[in-house]
């Protein structure tokens, strides 16, 4: 969320016994945190999913709200003042890129923060151009922001922050939706900006290998948001290696365990794409696609940001009409011989045939609790309540959500939201599951557990399609691959 004025001195961060408890919750997201970050330092914050990393960044950005949104203890300061009083010094890239795209044109969105802080108009557009180039977003400034992919929106959000030369740059999984080349471009853009301005950088990221070479310090948070390790990157990782692995933190040189697949004997096709074109009436994205989605097989959809992975996923899910060619279901997968195109199926017909997990999990939440969210689909289908309740309990346990069953889905961490969105589609046992970035926001432990669950689902005969940038996911699970160029 861009909120920084031009300055060339890094900000100092201080936490003194700081804690935050979200409204209506019994547990603390962060508890008794003591932390001091010197001006100009670059700090990588690690911790298992749900350890309060995002809450800490939101607190530093002054975005946690007042007493009606939660309870605060201790002190959290930026340059000796409350973060809300220092917003002209702070720029944050949120975990969800959609939530900080404000205006309809790329250039206007980057310029928005500078306009609010009174930067002279003559200086704004050169800074817009520089920021867009620095993050590798080579698009016209007039480009409609609604046409951007998730990864492009992440770059746009970062450009808006860097254009304002903040003293404190806060990054919450800034590369989660980026391809491998984009990850390095964004990291290098951040380090170049910090080199030029002296800004303090605090980055939260599950995958450590990208950021370890460019940070001065690693801070590891435990389950309650307390510091359990703090120091220079290499010695801290080496000294705490076993503890970090047991806590579910990704450690360089420790790949996830191999998963043994037990593929079903029959792999008949469920969907066939014939010269398929996907996109929107005014914005075609991809044409000439020919492939089959088969029962019990995992198909990975890969490619650089902006190549149409999410658009293809929505089309396969029956949520976006093809722009050309055909997407046909095979009997008996189709509701009837005359209704073979998923775009024409009713919502209840989709629930048991094709279920889709969106790139942004919040786009599919409709209820006020985690458990109710999982039960929503079965209720619509009027499934047996006893069997459904048992299945919901099983999924809550498998996806480490049992202790959050009564939480509002919107108060979960990014990784928890992703696992909940997966649970909501598995509960109805569809024949085909379409997932957009299924491993987003996962620590090592929850990643392994989620991938193992999807492997079991595929082995049971369910077809799985995953649009992903996660090479390890592809290597472990994919039987087939659709590479979009």
Residue ranges and their predicted role:
Residues 61, 317:
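Helix-to-loop junction immediately C-terminal to a conserved catalytic motif
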Residues 162, 425-426:
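ABC ATPase C-loop
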Residues 73-86, 326-349:
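ABC ATPase NBD Q-loop/coupling interface
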Residues 122-140, 386-404:
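Conserved ABC ATPase "signature" region
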């Amino acid at each position: 969320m861009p909120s920084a004025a031009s300055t060339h001195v890094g900000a100092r961060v201080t936490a003194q016994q700081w804690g935050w408890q979200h409204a209506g919750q019994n547990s603390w997201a962060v508890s008794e945190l003591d932390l001091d970050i010197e001006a100009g330092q670059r700090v990588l914050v690690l911790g298992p999913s749900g350890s309060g990393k995002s809450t800490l960044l939101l607190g530093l950005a002054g975005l946690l709200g007042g007493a009606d949104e939660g309870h605060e203890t201790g002190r959290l300061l930026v340059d000796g003042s409350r973060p809300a009083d220092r917003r002209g010094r702070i720029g944050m890239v949120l975990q969800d890129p959609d939530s900080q795209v404000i205006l309809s044109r790329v250039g206007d969105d980057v310029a928005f923060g500078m306009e609010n802080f009174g930067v002279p108009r003559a200086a704004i557009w050169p800074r817009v151009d520089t920021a867009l180039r620095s993050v590798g977003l080579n698009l016209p400034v007039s480009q409609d922001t609604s046409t951007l992919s998730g990864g492009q929106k992440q770059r746009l959000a970062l450009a808006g922050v860097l254009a304002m030369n903040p003293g404190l740059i806060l990054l919450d999984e800034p590369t989660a939706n980026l391809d491998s080349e984009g990850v390095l471009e964004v990291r290098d853009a951040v380090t170049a900006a910090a080199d030029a301005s002296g800004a303090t950088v605090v980055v939260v990221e599950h995958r450590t290998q990208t950021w370890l070479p460019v940070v001065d310090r690693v801070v590891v948070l435990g389950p309650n948001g307390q510091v359990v390790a703090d120091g220079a990157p290499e010695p801290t990782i080496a000294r705490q290696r076993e503890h970090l692995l047991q806590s579910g933190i990704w450690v360089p040189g420790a790949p996830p365990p191999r998963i043994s697949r037990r593929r079903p004997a029959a792999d008949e096709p469920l969907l066939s794409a014939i010269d398929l074109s996907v996109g929107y009436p005014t914005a075609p994205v991809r044409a000439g696609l020919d492939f089959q989605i088969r029962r019990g097989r995992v198909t990975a959809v890969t490619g650089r940001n902006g190549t149409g992975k999410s658009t293809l996923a929505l089309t396969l899910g029956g949520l976006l009409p093809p722009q050309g060619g055909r997407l046909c279901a095979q009997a008996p997968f189709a509701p009837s011989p005359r209704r073979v195109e998923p775009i024409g199926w009713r919502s209840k017909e989709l629930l048991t045939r094709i279920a889709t997990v969106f790139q942004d999990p919040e786009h599919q939440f409709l209820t006020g609790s985690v458990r109710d969210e999982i039960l929503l689909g079965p209720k619509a289908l009027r499934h047996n309540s006893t069997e459904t309740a048992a299945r919901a309990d099983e999924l809550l346990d498998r996806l480490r959500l049992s202790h959050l069953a009564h939480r509002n889905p919107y108060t979960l961490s990014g990784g928890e939201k992703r696992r909940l969105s997966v649970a909501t589609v598995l509960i109805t046992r569809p024949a085909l599951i379409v997932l957009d970035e299924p491993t987003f926001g996962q620590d090592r432990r929850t990643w392994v557990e989620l991938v193992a669950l999807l492997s079991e689902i595929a082995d049971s005969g369910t077809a799985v399609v995953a649009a992903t940038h996660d090479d390890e996911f592809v290597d472990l699970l994919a039987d087939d691959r659709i590479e979009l160029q």
